[in-house]
Amino acid sequence: MIAGYSILTLLVVALAGVGAGFVGYAVGASSLISYPALLALGVPPVIANASNTVGVLGTGFGGVLGARKELHGKHLRAAIYVTIGVVGGILGALLLLGLDPKVFEFVVPPLIALSSAAIALNPRGRAEAKQAAADAQAQAARLELEGSRQAVANPTKQRNQHPLVHTQTEPLSEDPWWVWLGVSCCAVYSGYFGAGAGTLVLAVLDAAGIGPFHQVNALKTLIGWGANMSASVVFIVRGVVDWPLAIAMCVGCFAGSYIAPPITRKVPARIMRIAAVIAGIALTID
């Protein structure tokens, strides 16, 4: 027993974290897997949410480490987005702790339903489709320029360079005002509850045409990471974190997000998206 929990229970939480980290990397919905797992153990909603916020930090760490190439040269935008995430996370966490717990229990089902709907509408899939079209067009232009013989002689090089053929992220000065409003609201939402927040941020950035998919996804990860870090600090200071569960979840989330990239190249993201939507629907009904 560790702080009242059996080793088996903590292993189950860690395994749920692996799934949450994996799904979080694939569709930005870690909490739709991890939060229900904590509720299933009988953890009160507010404590479950606080512990979950600390736990899914593992997903953020893994995602940020894996997105270093995508964030290269985007330091100013990355710093601003992390700052927005940090401020929004603090506001969301204080909002959660300042309101009556019954308010949280009342609004959770609609929030989960909204998150599930956002995933079902698949903004990431649309971004991937647009990115694939842009890649194909750029690939054709390059092949025409270099000649078909060079393309055939260096197929491995072509494949390795393929992910890097993208347009650049738009300058900050060209961002519409509603992008900043949307990102800020998503950051507050991430600190308050956060399930599906990554998908909502992705939807905002995708709609604004901020940049190619791989860069948008990296920026989305930064916003959520910043919000979760600051919200976690608030929850820790207030003493509402169940540490054994949070640590087990964090370890699992890191592992899941770390192994996700090579696997998601082979498994359709639609499968993970469907799993997240089903989890969200089940929790909403419950």
Predicted regions and their residues:
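Hydrophobic, aromatic-rich alpha-helical transmembrane segments
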Residues: 2-6, 10, 14, 49, ...
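Small-residue-rich segments of transmembrane alpha-helices in multi-pass membrane proteins
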Residues: 40, 45, 84-90, 115, ...
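Residue-level recognition of specific faces of alpha-helices
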Residues: 37, 47-53, 204, 215-218, ...
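Hydrophobic/aromatic residues within the transmembrane alpha-helices of Major Facilitator Superfamily
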Residues: 18, 22-26, 61, 117, ...
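Membrane-interface alpha-helices at helix entry/exit sites of multi-pass transporters
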Residues: 43-52, 75-80, 210-221
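Transmembrane helix exit motif
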Residues: 61-72, 110-151, 155-168, 282-286
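Selective hydrophobic functional segments
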Residues: 51-110, 114-115, 228-279
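Selected transmembrane alpha-helices and immediately adjacent juxtamembrane segments
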Residues: 1-44, 132-217
